[in-house]
Amino acid sequence: MEALSEQEIHQLAMDVVGRDLKDKSFEFLTVNSKPKKNPQFVCLKDKKLHFIVVNAILYPKNPVVFDTTLMNQVKEHGDKFKARTYYAGVGFAHAQDYQKPLSKNAPYVVNYDGLQEII
């Protein structure tokens, strides 16, 4: 089976977070699906601006752990716009063998605990 590319895995993470944001009634202003271009989502909710950084993480790494330097930089940028800043880590693993890479047409497991606000 053909392994998924970094961009394809990032797109899976974007889909997970995008569905979560939609379910929570966020209004999408900007969506950027490039993995290293932050933030990936700029949204409005209750007339407040929100910056969301999405990161796809492969097992065995923990999707809740983030790069504090990067997130502080994004928060500083968000503060200029009076935006709240969030990290959304989405973990993935091959469903049948966590040691295998993710591949096309193979099931996978998702580990997503929601948005973590950067304060």
Where are these regions (language model features)?
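Short acidic/glycine-enriched loop/turn segments that link adjacent beta-strands
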Residues: P35-N38
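Short coil/turn segments at beta-strand junctions that form active-site/ligand-binding loops
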Residues: F26, K48, A83
